[in-house]
Amino acid sequence: MGCSTSRNADVASAKLYVPELKELATMLQTALKDNFETVETEVTECIDLTKWGCAAPGIGGNCRIIDVGGVPNLLDPKYHKSAIFQLPSVAEQVGLKGAYIYGACAASHLVVGVNAELMPTEHISKKCRCTKYSKVLEDGSHTMEAYDSSEFGLLGNFVACDGKTTPVVKVRVKKRKGEENFVSCMRKGLAKALEESKVNVDGAKSAQIGIGGVFKVVSGKIHGHVMPDFKKTVMIDGPEVEEWLNFYEMGPDLTCLSVFLSGDPAKEKQESKEDFGLDLRLEHTHFFSQSKKEGGHYHFDKTPDDVEYVGYFLPAPVVYRVDNAFARERACQADK
């Protein structure tokens, strides 16, 4: 892969371990019990998620996780105009034309006019789109509006599926007593469970679980960010990006679209700095309100005594990596 500002349509994939739903419910119960005072997990039929503002009633059927682009597209201005993607094209690239897609990504600046957060929930074949975007205003406040496009920019983490109502794992937690946020707690708990069980998956270097789900912040406030417009200079990931982001306290009554993995199934050793695997982002959650102009990127809750989450989750058997921006940057460095 040479050094170029044009997009490369490369697609890689890796198998994931798919536990039985009862097993997954038990794993999540164990993962969450030390972090929240009340934890309830069960296998049940998914509620009608259109009532939560989603474009499909369920999250089941032919599930697959997708990681598109990457942070390098955000850091360097030379990619801001070229790193533009279309959800229907991504669905076709992973073999699920017309899919229901939900998750967390950046908006297209060509649609919004500025850099912004995107909360995609779109059933492509049914031509049903409930996507929202959130942007920073000139006075430093933020707003959220409907987004009438399938286009997104820079990076994204998604679940593609049929959008069917199927059995799922329902999780309800209240009153946080530990330090982890809701999503990180589940993700790290699954990683620990897999490490202890030594599960193998044919064709993968290491067994990992990938989860997609929709959850609601029923009560309490959360800490989230909204990206401002692009910087005109190259940023270094880390403190510089944290300082650039705009953080707000939002909630409750937030619908959260979440994608997370216990680890990268293409990596032999998860902590290795030489083994890049698929360069996967291990968790990404965006949220929107149905009653207020609030939306953005979820970090953690700010009111541990009052917080309550309830959500519906499913494992996916495969993760796809599309247009890997990290691999492109390594190729650029090698060409110098």
Can you name each region flagged by the protein language model?
Residues 7-206:
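Extended, low-hydrophobicity segments enriched in charged/polar residues
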Residues 260, 270-274, 278-332:
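Compact beta-sheet-dominated globular domain cores
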Residues 36, 85, 100-102, 133, ...:
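Phenylalanine-focused residue identity feature
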